[in-house]
Amino acid sequence: GKTRTLTYKIAYELSKIESNKQFVIAITYTNSAAEEIKERVEILGVDPALLWIGTIHSFCLHLILRPYHLYMDNLKYGFTVINSYDTEKILTELCKAYKNPRISYWDCGVIAKPDNIYLTCIDKNKHPSLKKVMKDYYGILENNKQIDFEQILKYSWDLLDRNLIISKSLSKIFSTILIDEYQDTKEIQYYIISRILKANNGNTKTFI
């Protein structure tokens, strides 16, 4: 049902593109959904060369951070994305120092919002210790020129928010943005997409 509808919308929008400088952007909830939709578009006989499809993290990484990281002081000398295994290892080690209250890697969840990155742990008694752990964790990442998944979203928003030229450049090459599973979109993802859409005065079409 829903995937099929999205596939047909993508195929239709691709068939209408007249310039090879414009792209149809489709944002999916998972990488496997992206692969499936791309395959279906090809089965319909439509060339996916002007389709960019992937998750919001992939979108931010490949279309915002990598092309424009020079605009950010802490990213301009390059960066890599830390994997979840290494993140877990670092946080588990850092948590060992805290016994009262005892904290673990599972308490270290965070969520990126437009103004900051926040702890998601519901036990407020653990927050003072967790704040210290996360400060040390982000310090280690900075020393290693690494960023994690939530920072991908936060830094992408910061770049768009501080540099109108980036939103304008992106909006000119995006003819259409389609978003799958829109109800699962976080606030910061909504901000990122909205900023790009606004920069083109509503000329970039969007389907959700």
Annotate the PLM regions.
Residues 1-71:
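P-loop NTPase Walker
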Residues 2, 186-208:
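Conserved helicase motor core of SF1/SF2 NTP-dependent helicases
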Residues 2-5, 23-25, 95-178, 187-192:
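Accessory N-terminal region flanking or inserted into the helicase ATPase core
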Residues 9, 36-41, 59-63, 90-94, ...:
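Alpha-helical scaffold elements adjacent to nucleotide-binding pockets in ATP/GTP-utilizing enzyme cores
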Residues 16-19, 45-46, 169-170, 198-203:
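Conserved catalytic network of the ASCE P-loop NTPase/AAA+ motor domain
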Residues 51, 176-177, 206-208:
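Hydrophobic "anchor" residues on beta-strands that sit immediately upstream
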Residues 67-87, 97-102:
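DNA-processing P-loop NTPase/helicase core
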Residues 181:
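Walker B catalytic acidic pair
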